């Protein structure tokens, strides 16, 4: 299954699983109002916010079990996460990479947190990611994962705890 999500509103629960081998870089401009689950189970990347910022108003879980990456808030400034973020990277995953474009930014709302569930494969990169408020952040990358990279321009407002095979900044 291939996805092309552009300037759409999702008012209920969304569960999107990518299985096609092609890479999907979604334009963006989407508003996700309900609980959202994004899964990449393919050999291509699954990206968001390539030309327009996305707004995630509910909790979101990103799970990568395919051999490429999930790319949230990839290329433009102004991506908003107004719910909690949970990250999973398993199977043959290359990892999850936030804000890869030179001007991309993501902001996590006050009282919300970004945490890991099962993260035993691939890397986690958080660039130009800002957490408002003081909610605790726990990122646990188990043995078998590659590394955690923070920055440039990444800010956490709360207590930050991480365990990872390698930590870069």
In which residue ranges do the predicted regions lie?
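Extracellular beta-strand-rich, repetitive "passenger/adhesive" scaffolds
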Residues: 1-31, 35-55, 61-80, 86-169
């Amino acid at each position: 299954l291939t996805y092309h999500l552009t300037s759409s509103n999702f008012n209920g629960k969304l569960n999107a699983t990518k299985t096609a081998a092609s890479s999907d870089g979604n334009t963006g401009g989407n508003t996700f109002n309900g609980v959202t689950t994004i899964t990449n189970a393919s050999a291509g990347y699954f990206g968001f916010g390539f030309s327009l910022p996305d707004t995630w108003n509910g909790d979101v879980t990103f799970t990568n079990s395919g051999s490429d990456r999930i790319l949230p808030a990839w290329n433009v400034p102004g991506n908003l996460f107004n719910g909690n973020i949970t990250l999973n990277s398993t199977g043959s995953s290359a990892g999850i990479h936030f804000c890869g474009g030179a001007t991309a930014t993501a902001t996590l709302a006050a009282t919300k947190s970004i945490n890991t569930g099962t993260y035993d494969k691939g890397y986690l990169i958080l660039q130009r990611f800002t957490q408002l408020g003081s909610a605790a952040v726990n990122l646990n990358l188990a043995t078998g994962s590659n590394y955690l990279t923070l920055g440039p321009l990444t800010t956490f407002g709360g207590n930050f705890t991480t365990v990872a095979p390698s930590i870069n900044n």
